[in-house]
C-alpha cells in the first residue's frame, strides 16, 4: 500500500492556474476513472474546489499522476510543477485530515470543505474508484473532522469564503440593510452568502441560477426573488452588490454587460465579488470606473484576522490530526501483516498438499506405510524450514545481529 496525495491550492498557485487545473462537475466522474486506471489498485479520488485541486491515489506513481494531470488539462510541466505539492503514506493521510478539518483552508476552520470532500468521495464511489484502503481513509477522515469540530473551538463563530465576501461588503457599504443584492448560483456557498446577508439586515436579494427550480427552493428560505441566468441583464442594473459562485466553465458576467448596467445606474458604484473557479466574472470588469471587482485571492486581509483568533484551536486540532493519522497507518500496517500471514499460510498449505498427494500415490502403489510416512515427514520438515534456514544463514554471515535476533524470536528459538 502506498498512498499518494498531489495537489495545488490557494497557497501555491494563483486563481489563473487553479482554474486551469479545476475539474468541472460534469467531467469529474470520467476523470476519476481515467486517473484510477493509472494506479495499480484502481483507487483514486479527486477533490476539486475553488481553492484547491487534489488527487488522492492508492498504489500510484507520483510522476505518472502528475503527468496524467498535465495531459488531462493540456498544460506544460514547467507551468504546473513549481506549484504542486505531494505527500506520501502517513503524510498524505494527515494532509487529507487537515484539509477536511478546515486546517488548510483559505479561511482557517471553515466547515464547507468537509462537505466538498464528502461529495468528492461520493462521486468516486459512483465512479467505482474506491476500494478498501481509500474507503477506510475517507471514512476515518470524516470521523476526525467531526472530532476536531466537537473537541476544539475551531468551528466557533464559523466563517467561510461566503462570510469573508459579506464582511468585505460591510466594509464598503455603511449599511447593508438598504442595499440590493444579486446572487449568481444556488449552491452551498451562495446559500451561506444569503444567510450571512440576511443576518446583516439585507432585505432585497435576487438569486440567478441555471435551473430556476433550485433558485426558487433557496429563495423560499430567504424571501428572495428567483430568476434564470438569461434574466441577469434585466436585474444587474438594480444591484449594488453582486456575489457569484457557480460551476460554469465560462464567465457569466462580461465587461460589456456590466458596463451597460453601470450606465443605467448612472454610474452608482457596484461591488462584485467573484468566488468561483473558473471565474464567473471577466477580469476586465475591474477596469471599469465604478465597478469594484474582487476574487477569492483578494480576501486575504479578512482571512488573516480570522487566523489569529483561531490559532490556539488550530494547534489542538493539529495534534488530533497527527495522532489519528498515526492510528490509521497502524491499521494499514496490520492490513499488510494480514496479507503476509495469508500468503505464508497459503504457501505452506500448498507444500503440504503437494507432499501429501505424493505420499498417497506411493501408498496406492503398494509402498511401505511406515517408510512413506517417514519420508513425508522429512520432506515436509525440510521444505518448511528451507526459507528460515536461508535467512538465518545470511544474517549470520553478514553479522546482522538485529535480524538474527528477530528471526530467532519469530522461530521460537529464544523463549523467555
Curated annotation (Swiss-Prot):
Q: Name one Pfam family in it.
A: Shikimate_DH
Q: Which family does it belong to?
A: Belongs to the glutamyl-tRNA reductase family.
Active-site residues annotated for this sequence: 50 (nucleophile)
Q: InterPro entries, from UniProt?
A: 4pyrrol_synth_GluRdtase, 4pyrrol_synth_GluRdtase_dimer, 4pyrrol_synth_GluRdtase_N, GluRdtase_CS, GluRdtase_dimer_dom_sf, GluRdtase_N_sf, NAD(P)-bd_dom_sf, Shikm_DH/Glu-tRNA_Rdtase
> What does the record list as GO biological process?
protoporphyrinogen IX biosynthetic process from glutamate
Disulfide bond annotation, renumbered to this chain: none
NCBIfam families, alphabetized = hemA (TIGR01035)
- UniProt protein name: Glutamyl-tRNA reductase
Enzyme Commission number, as recorded: 1.2.1.70
- The feature of type site (Important for activity) is located at 95
Q: What does this protein do?
A: Catalyzes the NADPH-dependent reduction of glutamyl-tRNA(Glu) to glutamate 1-semialdehyde (GSA).
Q: Does the keyword RNA-binding apply?
A: no
Amino acid at each position: 500500500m502506498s498512498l499518494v496525495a498531489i495537489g495545488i491550492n490557494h497557497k501555491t498557485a494563483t486563481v489563473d492556474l487553479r482554474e486551469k487545473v479545476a475539474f468541472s462537475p460534469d467531467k469529474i466522474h470520467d476523470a476519476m476513472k481515467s486517473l484510477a486506471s493509472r494506479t495499480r489498485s484502481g483507487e483514486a479520488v479527486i477533490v476539486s474546489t475553488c481553492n484547491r485541486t487534489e488527487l488522492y491515489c492508492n498504489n500510484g506513481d507520483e510522476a505518472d499522476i502528475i503527468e496524467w494531470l498535465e495531459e488531462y488539462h493540456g498544460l506544460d510541466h514547467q507551468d504546473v510543477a513549481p506549484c504542486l505539492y505531494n505527500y506520501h503514506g502517513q503524510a498524505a493521510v494527515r494532509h487529507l485530515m487537515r484539509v477536511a478539518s478546515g486546517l488548510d483552508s483559505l479561511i482557517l476552520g471553515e466547515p464547507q470543505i468537509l462537505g466538498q470532500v464528502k461529495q468528492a468521495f461520493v462521486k468516486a464511489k459512483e465512479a467505482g474508484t474506491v476500494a478498501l484502503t481509500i474507503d477506510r481513509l475517507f471514512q476515518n477522515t470524516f470521523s476526525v473532522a467531526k472530532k476536531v469540530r466537537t473537541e476544539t473551538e475551531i468551528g466557533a463563530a464559523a466563517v467561510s469564503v461566503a462570510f469573508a465576501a459579506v464582511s468585505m461588503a460591510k466594509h464598503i457599504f455603511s449599511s447593508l440593510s438598504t442595499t440590493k443584492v444579486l446572487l449568481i448560483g444556488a449552491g452551498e456557498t451562495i446559500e451561506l452568502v444569503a444567510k450571512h446577508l440576511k443576518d446583516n439586515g439585507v432585505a432585497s436579494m435576487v438569486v440567478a441560477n441555471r435551473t430556476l427550480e433550485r433558485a426558487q427552493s433557496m429563495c423560499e428560505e430567504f424571501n428572495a426573488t428567483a430568476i434564470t441566468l438569461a434574466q441577469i441583464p434585466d436585474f444587474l442594473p438594480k444591484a449594488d452588490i453582486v456575489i457569484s459562485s457557480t460551476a460554469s466553465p465560462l464567465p457569466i458576467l462580461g465587461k460589456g454587460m456590466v458596463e451597460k448596467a453601470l450606465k443605467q445606474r448612472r454610474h452608482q458604484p457596484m461591488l462584485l465579488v467573484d468566488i468561483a473557479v473558473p471565474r464567473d466574472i471577466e477580469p476586465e470588469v475591474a477596469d471599469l470606473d465604478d465597478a469594484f471587482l474582487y476574487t477569492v485571492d483578494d480576501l486575504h486581509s479578512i482571512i488573516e484576522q480570522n487566523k489569529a483568533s483561531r490559532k490556539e484551536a488550530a494547534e489542538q486540532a493539529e495534534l488530533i490530526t497527527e495522532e489519528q493519522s498515526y492510528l490509521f497507518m497502524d491499521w494499514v500496517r496490520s492490513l499488510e501483516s494480514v496479507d503476509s500471514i495469508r500468503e505464508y499460510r497459503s504457501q505452506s498449505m500448498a507444500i503440504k498438499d503437494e507432499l501429501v498427494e505424493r505420499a498417497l500415490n506411493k501408498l496406492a502403489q503398494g509402498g511401505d506405510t511406515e517408510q512413506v510416512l517417514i519420508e513425508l515427514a522429512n520432506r515436509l520438515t525440510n521444505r518448511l524450514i528451507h526459507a528460515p534456514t536461508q535467512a538465518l544463514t545470511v544474517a549470520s554471515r553478514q553479522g546482522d545481529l538485529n535480524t538474527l535476533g528477530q528471526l530467532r524470536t519469530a522461530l521460537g528459538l529464544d523463549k523467555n
